[in-house]
Amino acid sequence: MAAGSTGERPFFEIITSVRYWIIHAVTLPAIFIAGFLFVSTGLAYDAFGTPRPDTYFQASETKAPVVSQRFESKAQLDLRLK
């Protein structure tokens, strides 16, 4: 081991190894597919509690609601949704 070395493999050696690409050829597409399914199925909306695009506005509304009282905004929006 050379002086000042941390004992880790050089990055270039890692990314040129067959073992690295065998592992990552499976994991990287799997992460992408899992993320795509998480968003496309709507599970992301449920997990984070955000409204779905079709529920932002009611059908009778033509513009976004305006909150007039800063500290009573939740009550105003809840009243709007009833």
Swiss-Prot record:
UniProt-listed GO biological process terms: photosynthetic electron transport chain
Matching InterPro entries: PSII_cyt_b559_asu, PSII_cyt_b559_asu_sf, PSII_cyt_b559_N, PSII_cytb559_asu_lum
Pfam families: Cytochrom_B559 (PF00283), Cytochrom_B559a (PF00284)
Main location: membrane
Membrane protein topology class: Single-pass membrane protein
TM spans (from-to): 22-36
Cellular compartments annotated: Cellular thylakoid membrane
Cofactor: binding comment: With its partner (PsbF) binds heme. PSII binds additional chlorophylls, carotenoids and specific lipids.
Signal sequence coordinates: none
A Gene Ontology molecular function term of the record: heme binding
Sequence positions that bind heme: H24
UniProtKB keywords: Electron transport, Heme, Iron, Membrane, Metal-binding, Photosynthesis, Photosystem II, Thylakoid, Transmembrane, Transmembrane helix, Transport
Gene3D superfamilies linked to this entry: Photosystem II cytochrome b559, alpha subunit
A GO CC term assigned to this protein in UniProt: plasma membrane-derived thylakoid membrane
Obligatory cofactor(s): heme b
Top-level lineage group: Bacteria
Entries under HAMAP family matching the protein: PSII_PsbE
Assembly and oligomerization: Heterodimer of an alpha subunit and a beta subunit. PSII is composed of 1 copy each of membrane proteins PsbA, PsbB, PsbC, PsbD, PsbE, PsbF, PsbH, PsbI, PsbJ, PsbK, PsbL, PsbM, PsbT, PsbX, PsbY, Psb30/Ycf12, peripheral proteins PsbO, CyanoQ (PsbQ), PsbU, PsbV and a large number of cofactors. It forms dimeric complexes.
Family, per entry: Belongs to the PsbE/PsbF family.
Function, in words: This b-type cytochrome is tightly associated with the reaction center of photosystem II (PSII). PSII is a light-driven water:plastoquinone oxidoreductase that uses light energy to abstract electrons from H(2)O, generating O(2) and a proton gradient subsequently used for ATP formation. It consists of a core antenna complex that captures photons, and an electron transfer chain that converts photonic excitation into a charge separation.
The protein, known as: Cytochrome b559 subunit alpha
Species whose genome carries this gene: Prochlorococcus marinus (strain SARG / CCMP1375 / SS120)
Lineage of origin: Bacteria, Bacillati, Cyanobacteriota, Cyanophyceae, Synechococcales
